[in-house]
């Protein structure tokens, strides 16, 4: 409800996708998950939680929807995202200045290495082009709160999506694995809600 009011107030069209509740997934889906991959390769203290599995599937379903309907690009916002009042202008200016071959733009992200030159965009923000780490690096661009993905980017993520074995932000953030051409807005212009968990993870929080 809060994000709907915010986006409507900014004059942005949007569509809600039903989140996948990991606790309600059928046994056939849960049995197909590779629970060992994440802790083995990325030093997680525990295997994927049901909340993380549901979250990953929710994002993957959007990529599949894009491919099935030939949607050229989409901005994906998690339900607890807090969007800057300048978000619309930031997106428009970014798309006017970015390389046409871009595939992924993060509006929220953790630390990440980028190429030296950054383009200035509205309201003092900068557009950075991110460097892919070495192929076997564990480094990842964390957070899948808000990002733009193109059709070609969605196809690349789907090539690495199955079996389910990573949280949503590891699938988007492991650009050394997916080879997605990735950019980001610096500093972030969308933030994670601090007082409420995402609808798909109310009971089982990732870091608890």
Identify the role of each PLM range.
Residues 1-77, 81-208:
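An acidic/histidine-cluster motif and surrounding catalytic segment
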